[in-house]
């Protein structure tokens, strides 16, 4: 039996008809507000639209009041290079020579726990389409991954699926994966974080925006067919009794995780680029979260009129789909374009060339309304702004948790520290052989890092570097970082430390940092303590970007990351984009470019171990105060590194972060397959020098012929620079080693074996 379609006319005539708005996540007052907006009860299709568009994920209703601070702290000077910012599909910045870069990071956390492979794969696909929608060619991806404890039973299932999903989708698209992070912590058990970043490049004049203007212009849906995947809770609308099976209009339970097809998306990318090149698109929007509900309402809301859509024209891949399901489907690999009538034939011809299904489903109107019909009957008639941009805004209670004082007071001062050479050596190997610091090659080798041929630096480097222009060598650098442990101790400082590290990681490649994006992963916004963490992190990130003089161009918020009442560590992920005028002068990570290089430590080392990897691995300790943040010092470091790169004064560079100086030394030695001898300055405490996680520090290798020039430049700029060793190939025929003079020596073979065997042993 076919369910009667709930039309606008029927809704007006049946004001008391019961509707499952609570099951769809709407609160009583939100439902009443919808009735007030419409002057009647919503139809099932309208209810589906409002429920998904007013969700936390789409509306930012709990975070919006705090996110405004980004705009308040962005100066006109910071906006000078920004071509598109917060509110667009992705941020876009001018990178010189007529080029622009667009980048964004988004979460796909919850789907990646339910179905790790498809959750992660479609996370990559979704962020790639955001970049496509700006008029850009996607050129690379990165990822920030968080899993439960490495030895927890479920971590293997989740990690295996997530890594295969990211690699399977990204590799099939032909996009290099040029970096990221993988972190294990018990707080992420049952709630992994899968944050995918994509970067694209375009000529400035090719920028596209998401708006529907020009009455009479056509709305064309193109890409994959629309199915039942990704609908989730909206399926309760398919039955008057909220029951039934999955085969017809009474189906109750539908898949909440989307299913991706990277080969369809690969063709869609090329199709879009040809459409852009032929100037056949007025406005464009990808179909991601909330599907057609989002695309139609956002295009209409951002445009200058309204929109009429004939929903029965939407190509389907499942029988008996209801209007609510069609509007809410999150089937992947779909785009929605606004096209002038004169260009429709040419648009369709390009789609046919690429074998991309394209359908004219409606047109732009001057009514100021979003009207959607189903076989001639109106099922949606709403003001589009009320769906897309004027949803509820909450000022949720914000309260610093009472437990925060005890957490901060519980410092590492009482922990036993290694002091002898043997103890320091054992500590190094303990940290290097832990899931916290071991090699990620088991994961990253499943990704293609060099496809497309424009990757200049990738995994093992602090930031990824890509060539943009073959003729001039102009390129971009990008890094993404986060520290849930530091953010738990001090959310304001933790967010700034993540920003500072991403900024520094871009700078050590020789590039100049120019823009910021973010993905803010937190627990429930209904918890005042979580909202305190969130609000502090936002302010820290915004103030930090202002201090560094680079704009936050966009971002994403992911709330409700918790299992039961246990929230994840607050994890603000920060991405920083940089520009390098010629990728030939990029600075690699590995030692050994030139024989006998001098190793110089830039920055100040302090006794800072609270929240450190050392405390975590050796004592399972989290407490105290995170390292000091000095953003003026970070800017100075970046200026020195850029100048050193331009003048050829530095042959390698590596930032200091987790694990401190000795971890950086080991990584740079392994990357360059060469040994080194560390000589600690007189009076320096060996443990503090080797393992402190003080921020604002970089280890550089300087050719012997340039040492005096480089140190003079640092001195002139007021940047501490201490000679701490030399690159040493080792005795002829002997095994290269890392030697800390007077304390210990470890061969590269032992370091490599210790580091590289951990993850294969756990997950191989």
From Swiss-Prot:
Its EC number is 6.3.5.3. Mg(2+) 2 binds at residues 130, 286. It is found in: Cytoplasm. Pathway: Purine metabolism; IMP biosynthesis via de novo pathway; 5-amino-1-(5-phospho-D-ribosyl)imidazole from N(2)-formyl-N(1)-(5-phospho-D-ribosyl)glycinamide: step 1/2. It catalyses: N(2)-formyl-N(1)-(5-phospho-beta-D-ribosyl)glycinamide + L-glutamine + ATP + H2O = 2-formamido-N(1)-(5-O-phospho-beta-D-ribosyl)acetamidine + L-glutamate + ADP + phosphate + H(+). The active site is at residues 57, 108. Substrate binds at residues 107-110, 129, 258, 330-332, 558. SUPFAM superfamilies: PurM C-terminal domain-like, PurM N-terminal domain-like. Mg(2+) 1 binds at residues 106, 556. Keywords: ATP-binding, Cytoplasm, Ligase, Magnesium, Metal-binding, Nucleotide-binding, Purine biosynthesis. ATP binds at residues 60, 104, 518, 555. It holds the Pfam family AIRS_C. GO terms for cellular component: cytoplasm. Residues 1-23 are annotated as: Disordered. GO terms for biological process: 'de novo' IMP biosynthetic process. InterPro entries: PRibForGlyAmidine_synth_PurL, PurL_linker, PurM-like_C_dom, PurM-like_C_sf, PurM-like_N, PurM-like_N_sf. Monomer. Part of the FGAM synthase complex composed of 1 PurL, 1 PurQ and 2 PurS subunits. Belongs to the FGAMS family. This is Phosphoribosylformylglycinamidine synthase subunit PurL. It comes from Mycolicibacterium vanbaalenii (strain DSM 7251 / JCM 13017 / BCRC 16820 / KCTC 9966 / NRRL B-24157 / PYR-1) (Mycobacterium vanbaalenii). The lineage of its organism: Bacteria, Bacillati, Actinomycetota, Actinomycetes, Mycobacteriales. The gene is purL.
């Amino acid at each position: 039996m076919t369910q009667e379609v709930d039309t606008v006319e029927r809704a007006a005539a049946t004001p008391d008809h019961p509707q499952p708005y609570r099951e769809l996540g709407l609160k009583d007052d939100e439902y009443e507000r919808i009735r007030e907006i419409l002057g009647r009860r919503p139809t099932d299709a309208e209810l589906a639209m409002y429920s998904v568009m007013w969700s936390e994920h789409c509306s930012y209703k709990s975070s919006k009041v705090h996110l405004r601070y980004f705009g308040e702290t962005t100066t006109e000077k910071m906006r000078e290079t920004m071509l598109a910012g917060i509110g667009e599909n992705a941020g876009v910045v001018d990178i010189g020579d007529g080029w622009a870069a667009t980048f964004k990071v988004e979460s796909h956390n919850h789907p990646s726990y339910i179905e790790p492979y498809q959750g992660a794969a479609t996370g990559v696909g979704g962020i790639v389409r955001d970049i496509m929608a700006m008029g850009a060619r996607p050129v690379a991806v990165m990822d920030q991954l968080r899993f439960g404890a490495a030895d927890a039973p479920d971590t293997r299932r989740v990690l295996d699926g997530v890594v295969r999903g990211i690699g399977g989708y990204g590799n099939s698209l032909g996009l290099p994966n040029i970096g990221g992070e993988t972190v294990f912590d018990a707080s992420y058990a049952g709630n992994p974080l899968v944050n995918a970043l994509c970067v694209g490049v375009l000529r400035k004049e090719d920028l596209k925006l998401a708006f529907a203007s020009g009455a009479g212009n056509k709305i064309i849906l193109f890409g994959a067919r629309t199915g039942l995947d990704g609908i989730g809770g909206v399926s309760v609308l398919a039955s008057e009794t909220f029951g039934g099976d999955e085969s017809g209009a009474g189906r109750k339970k539908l898949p909440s995780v989307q299913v991706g097809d990277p080969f369809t998306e690969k063709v869609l990318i090329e199709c879009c680029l040809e459409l852009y090149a032929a100037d056949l698109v007025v406005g464009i929007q990808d179909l991601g979260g909330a599907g057609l509900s989002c695309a139609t309402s956002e295009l209409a809301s951002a445009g200058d009129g309204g929109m009429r859509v004939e929903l029965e024209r939407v190509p389907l891949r499942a029988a008996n789909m209801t209007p609510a399901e069609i509007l809410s489907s999150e089937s992947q690999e779909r785009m929605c374009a606004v096209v002038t009538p004169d260009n429709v034939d040419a648009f369709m011809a390009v789609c046919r060339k690429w074998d991309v299904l394209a359908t004219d489903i409606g047109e732009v109107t001057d009514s100021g309304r979003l009207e959607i019909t189903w076989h001639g009957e109106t099922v949606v008639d709403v003001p589009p702004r009320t769906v897309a941009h004027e949803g509820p805004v909450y000022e949720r209670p914000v309260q610093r948790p009472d437990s925060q004082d005890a957490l901060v007071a519980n410092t590492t001062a009482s922990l036993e520290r290694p002091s002898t050479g043997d103890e320091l050596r054992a500590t190094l190997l303990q940290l290097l052989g832990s899931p916290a610091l071991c090699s990620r090659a088991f994961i990253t080798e499943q990704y293609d890092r060099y496809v497309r041929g424009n990757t200049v630096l990738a995994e093992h480097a602090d930031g990824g570097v890509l060539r943009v222009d073959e003729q001039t060598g102009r390129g971009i650098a990008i890094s993404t970082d986060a520290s849930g442990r530091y953010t738990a101790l001090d959310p304001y400082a933790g967010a700034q430390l993540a920003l500072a590290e991403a900024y520094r990681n871009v700078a050590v490649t020789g590039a100049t940092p120019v823009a910021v994006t973010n993905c803010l992963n937190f627990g429930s916004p209904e918890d005042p303590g979580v909202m305190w963490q969130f609000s502090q992190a936002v302010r820290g990130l915004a103030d930090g970007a202002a201090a560094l003089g680079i704009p936050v161009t966009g971002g994403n918020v992911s709330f409700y990351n918790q299992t039961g009442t246990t929230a994840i560590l607050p994890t603000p992920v920060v991405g920083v984009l940089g520009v390098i005028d010629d990728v030939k002068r990029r600075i690699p990570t590995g030692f050994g470019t030139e024989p006998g290089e001098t190793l110089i430590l830039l920055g100040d080392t302090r006794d800072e171990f609270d929240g450190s990897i050392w405390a975590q691995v050796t004592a399972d300790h989290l407490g105290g105060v995170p390292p000091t943040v000095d953003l003026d010092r970070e800017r100075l470091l970046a200026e020195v590194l850029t100048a050193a790169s331009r003048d050829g004064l530095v042959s390698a560079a590596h930032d200091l972060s987790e694990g401190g100086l000795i971890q950086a030394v080991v990584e740079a030695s392994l990357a360059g397959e060469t040994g080194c001898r560390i000589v600690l300055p007189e009076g320096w405490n060996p443990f503090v020098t080797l393992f402190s996680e003080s921020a604002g520090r970089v280890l550089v290798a300087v050719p012997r012929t340039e040492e005096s020039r480089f140190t003079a430049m640092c001195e002139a700029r007021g940047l501490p620079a201490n000679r701490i060793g030399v690159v040493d190939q080792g005795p002829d025929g002997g095994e290269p080693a890392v030697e800390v003079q007077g304390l210990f020596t470890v061969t590269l073979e032992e370091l490599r074996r210790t580091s590289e065997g951990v993850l294969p042993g756990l997950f191989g």
